[in-house]
């Protein structure tokens, strides 16, 4: 990761998204509103003001999602965190003068369960307190790295299945070859069924390749659904657009790169495009591009 220092400045424009009136019984259909700023009063806990009403939000102590919006120019658009927020209320909030103010843990003390989006492998934020912007940065950075590790693990699993098929075929040569000819199988007596054994090994290799392809296709499908789900949850709010526009002007030269060079080529049977490229970081709104590999570095188009 590089240029993460700029994220401290950019987080001054970050927003939080919480349900405005609780969570409906049917779960994900909960209404959301966008909060334009974190507010703070001297001697009082940090509170959140509604960008629609100007009033302070009251969050029921229910299981809900919090969205930390990071400027799109950094390649990390939004990080959804499963959370269990406490009920809070501050009747007279004042606009914050600078994000250098500490975020009071009374507001974000109960970020629990679920982890960052991609619940299957990004389950790292369990009971964590964010008391400063630096901790938010660390959490985002760790999530990006964990996501890269998870993708790498999937590719290694596919690669391992293919390698097992190769090892099995090579084992046939090792067991039955008793001379130095270039193709020892041709010199074996087929009366012992050696050719049948070899053919069986080739069939098993083909089966391993097929299974690997199916596993990769299933994983890619899951990732595509995850991106679609996130796209549906991101709100097209004017205040959010203003935040993104302002942040781009401040950090237009910034970049956050994380590349995982773990590509495999299965000899034409399955080609993952040379590897997994996270491009500009963790761009959860990006398209799933199988022509050039699994590219999660796109930006959500607002």
Swiss-Prot record:
Tissue expression as described in the entry: Component of the acid-insoluble organic matrix of calcified layers of the shell (at protein level).
Stretch list, region Disordered: 221-257
Localisation per UniProt entry: Secreted
Coiled-coil zones: 198-234
The keyword Oxidoreductase appears for this protein: no
GO CC term (a single one): extracellular region
Signal peptide, first to last residue: 1-22
Keyword Signal: yes
Comp. bias regions, Acidic residues: 223-257
Residues that carry a glycan: 242
Keywords recorded for this protein, A-Z: Coiled coil, Glycoprotein, Secreted, Signal
Protein name: Coiled-coil domain-containing protein 2
Species whose genome carries this gene: Lottia gigantea (Giant owl limpet)
Lineage, highest ranks first: Eukaryota, Metazoa, Spiralia, Lophotrochozoa, Mollusca
């Amino acid at each position: 990761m590089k240029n993460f220092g700029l994220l401290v400045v950019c987080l001054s424009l970050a927003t939080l998204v919480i349900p405005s009136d609780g969570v409906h019984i049917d779960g994900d259909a909960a209404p959301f509103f966008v909060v334009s700023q974190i507010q703070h009063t001297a001697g009082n806990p940090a509170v959140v003001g509604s960008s629609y009403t100007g009033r302070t939000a009251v969050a029921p102590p229910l299981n809900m999602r919090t969205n930390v919006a990071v400027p799109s120019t950094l390649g990390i658009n939004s990080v959804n965190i499963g959370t269990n927020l406490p009920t809070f209320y501050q009747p007279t909030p004042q606009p914050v003068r600078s994000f250098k103010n500490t975020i009071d843990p009374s507001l974000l003390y109960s970020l629990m369960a679920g982890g960052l989006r991609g619940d299957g492998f990004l389950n790292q934020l369990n009971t964590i307190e964010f008391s400063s912007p630096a901790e938010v940065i660390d959490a985002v950075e760790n999530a990006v790295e964990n996501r890269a590790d998870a993708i790498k693990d999937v590719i290694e699993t596919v690669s391992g299945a293919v390698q097992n098929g190769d090892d099995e075929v090579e084992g046939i040569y090792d067991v039955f070859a008793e001379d130095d000819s270039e193709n020892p199988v041709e010199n074996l007596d087929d009366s012992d069924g050696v050719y049948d054994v070899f053919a069986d090994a080739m069939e098993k290799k083909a089966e391993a390749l097929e299974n690997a392809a199916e596993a990769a296709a299933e994983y890619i499908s899951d990732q595509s659904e995850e991106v679609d789900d996130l796209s549906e949850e991101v709100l097209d709010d004017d205040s959010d657009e203003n935040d993104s526009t302002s942040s781009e002007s401040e950090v237009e030269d910034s970049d956050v790169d994380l590349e995982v060079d773990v590509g495999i080529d299965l000899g034409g049977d399955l080609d993952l495009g040379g590897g997994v490229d996270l491009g500009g970081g963790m761009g959860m709104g990006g398209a799933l591009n199988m022509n050039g590999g699994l590219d999660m570095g796109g930006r959500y188009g607002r």
